[in-house]
Amino acid sequence: MSHNSFGHLFRVTTWGESHGLALGCVVDGCPPGITFTEAEIQAYLDKRKPGQSKYTTQRREPDQVRVLSGVLLGDDGVTMTTTGTPISMMIENTDQRSKDYGEIARQYRPGHADYTYDVKYGIRDYRGGGRSSARETAARVAAGAIARKVVPGLEVKGALVAMGVHGIDRRRWNWSEVDNNPFFSPDAGSVELFADYLDGIRKSGSSVGAVIEIIAEGVPAGIGAPIYGKLDQDIASLLMSINAVKGVEIGNGFEAARLTGEENADEMRIGNDGKPLFLSNHAGGILGGIATGAPVVARFAVKPTSSILTPRRSIDKDGKEVDVMTKGRHDPCVGIRAVPIGEAMVACAIADHYLRHRGQTGRV
């Protein structure tokens, strides 16, 4: 199985399976001299880890990260400094229940990658989905924590803006609310609505999708490249690589198709600081594949979790028709925990383009 790496200069390789002993990543190309602590990485992993509320899977994983290489430990015993060599990080799996998946060892769960993995490789790890499980994304979040350190002044934030048929009221958007509720919603008024809605979904044994919005501020103007090396192209690619993601848009995205040229174009003036100022940001901070200096805005759609308690028609490996009902512990809305994952992937894309731009032009 190939295609376990992404990035050019800031290159990330992830490894491990849902029910293996551990999973992790190797970050290659991180510049030397960057300082961080394991606690800083852990803070992002804690946002993604399971079992934190009744609205996520009850699999209990501490997701404790260990940095194995690529750093020098400071005299304080806490601060690490990158050496420029590959940074390897590991997260142990501690709460696997492989027996929950015994009945589907030869059955294909509708909506999952069971059939496609089998038809491609002739073998699949049925225990929690193996490599195709969202468990793999913990390693991406760890890599994203390093990526944030590469670009000075970069701030990447995410929020859940829609769940099923319900969306937030953007007039009430408040970033300080995101970490105050189990849905990462920036709208305090939507929390009770989401809770009641998801309670009903969860109790029925079903699932629901979500839309996540990521905003990156402090992105240097000029990073990115035209034609086949676009910043938005790579952001879209990395967001699409996240489990269950079925759509991505940058800036206005599909809404731009409903606007006129006058409505969609971002007009410019010179700001009070003497620098170019965009009067709007319909482009989502990227034009021609190159960052404008305005906030980079991306949204992605996460489909409903395919592991549900309702029997679904399918087939097994022997070609027999079967009814499949998934057991085990699963997220009724996997989009909730996709927020820190989306942040990590956007951070990695920006860090990679930042280093590529610096290498090509000698400036940032």
UniProtKB/Swiss-Prot annotation:
Entry's family note: Belongs to the chorismate synthase family.
PANTHER family, per database record: CHORISMATE SYNTHASE
Subunit structure: Homotetramer.
Name by which UniProt lists this protein: Chorismate synthase
GO cellular component: cytosol
InterPro entries xref list: Chorismate_synth, Chorismate_synth_AroC_sf, Chorismate_synthase_CS
Keyword Cell wall biogenesis/degradation: no
Binding residues annotated for NADP(+), in chain numbering: 48
Enzyme class: lyase
Function summary: This reaction introduces a second double bond into the aromatic ring system.
